[in-house]
Structures are given as C-alpha cells and as structure tokens.
Amino acid sequence: MKANDIKKGNVVEYNNGVYQIRDIERSSPQGRGGNVRFRFIMYSVPGGNKLDASFDADDNLVEVELLRRQSTYSYKDGDAFVFLDDEDYTPYTLDADVIGDDAGYITDGLTGIYVQVIDEQPVAIQLPASVVLEVIETPPELKGGTATKRPKPAKLNTGIEIMVPEYIVNGERVLVNTATGEFAGRAD
C-alpha cells in the first residue's frame, strides 16, 4: 500500500515491527521537485512504543491483516477501558495510553466501536463517526447577538471542550464528530 493511501488507524509493517498509524502530517515542499512527503506518528503493536517516520508518497508499506470486532464500551478498570464484543461478549481491555485522546468520546454503553485485534490481542479502537455527548458547562447566549455566528466553548460530560453555536445551552445533547472533534449538530 502506498504511503499516500494510508489513513489514521491503519496497521502496517515497518522495520520488522507492526505499527498503528495514529497521526499523519502531509507536507509538499516547494524545492526538491515538489515531492509530497508524509510524516507518520506510529505506535508499536503491541507495546505502544512511539515511532516517528517520514515517507515519500510512492513508498510502499505492507498493511497488516487485523480483525475488526464490533463492540460496546462496558466499564473502566483502573486506567484500562473494557469493551465487550457484540457477538460473543469477549472482553477486550485496552490501556488509557492506547486509547489516547479518543477517551474523550467514550461514554457508558457506547456502541458502534470497532476493536482492532491482531493475534487475538486487542491493539486499538475505531470510534463511530459521531457520538452524542452532553453539554455540562457553556456561557449563556448573548442577547442581540443573533446577527453573527459566533461559536462559544462548551465543556462536555466526558471532560473534553469543543466550540458550539451560541444557541446551545447547558444540559443539551450534541453530536460530536470523532475524527475532527467538532460540533456536528444537535442530538435528538
């Protein structure tokens, strides 16, 4: 698979190890003939050791076959998150450092999560495209400010903060895009 086809969450072989891509930076320098370069932040699977590597768009990486098991978030065990397989109720336990920033989107009973499994070991999760979270703290709407679309900060029930439109109030349930971390509309 070419470097320019790789997406966040893919698992690849590199330097005799297996790594999951967590972040991708694309740069197109003006010199050097304008070759597009990709910088991947990867974590070893299993182990979670961070690796930073750069590739040209045409560089080939071998994608690793992994199982994707649809699961539901069950509970937190210390720093670990426990997910139950939707079909056979197999528990998958992943440490908080493996979950990373995705922890801010995980609520009790969240469904539609895919646990990625290699050699019967859970290595990562893939969240649904959007999740419903509750606004617990946001400033009130400014009266007379309806002509402008000013976003305002809102703290959500999982502890993350996003920008929301002015008409959103405390206690309201909102959709949040898990890929961008942005407000995606009202829930319900």
Swiss-Prot record:
What does the entry list under GO cellular component?
cytoplasm
Stored Pfam families: EFP, EFP_N, Elong-fact-P_C
| GO biological process, alphabetically ordered | peptide biosynthetic process
GO MF term list: translation elongation factor activity
CDD domains linked to this entry: S1_EF-P_repeat_1 (cd04470), S1_EF-P_repeat_2 (cd05794)
Task: Look up the domain of life of the source.
Answer: Bacteria
Stored PROSITE patterns:
EFP
Signal sequence span per UniProt?
A: none
- Family named by the database record: Belongs to the elongation factor P family.
This protein is called what?
Elongation factor P-like protein
